[in-house]
Amino acid sequence: PIGGITTQGVAFGANVNTRAILDMTAQFDFYHGGGLDVCYLSFAEVDQHGNVNVHKFNGKIMGTGGFIDISATSRKIVFCGTLTAGGLKTEVGEGSLRITQEGRVTKFVESLPEITFSGKVALERGLDVRYITERAVFTLKEDGLHLIEVAPGVDIERDVCSKMAFRPIIDENLKTMDPCLFTDAVMGFK
């Protein structure tokens, strides 16, 4: 479905007030035809070259679903996930992020056993690729992953770099995320 609201509970999967409903083949034709300007996808693992693995980890094959079709034709790709996994607990409030329990699993690894998305191919195609986590934002450049933004309350060395298997390039224009993202209040969008 395009637009509308997804229902919850026992009616999960149904939508209300949709603008359009397409069958799967039409949706994939849209992807293959370059209909996406930007896509938002998750990641299981990311390496120092910006490669992403979503289909095989922890000894299990999960499959790629439509991941390859979507990422192969989008002009901008935004990967979203947590920096670590397996027990990660965070708190937000007063305009900052606090990590109360670190995850046991490193998701930003030196190299990947399986590559679902190629950072090299993305760079060759001139794509804008971002990796957004709860505490840091990275962008892919020719020389690797650049740390471009951190959450308020996060220590770069303790909470970001030490939780990665490689050291990202710290951008010279490193920014702090807007504190309003870390408050339990209306953000005031207009």
Task: Describe each model-derived feature in a short phrase.
Residues 1-3:
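Glycine-rich phosphate/diphosphate-binding loop of Rossmann-like nucleotide-binding domains
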Residues 188-190:
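Short, low-order "capping/linker" segments at domain edges
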Residues 5-186:
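Conserved phosphate- and dinucleotide-binding cores of soluble alpha/beta proteins
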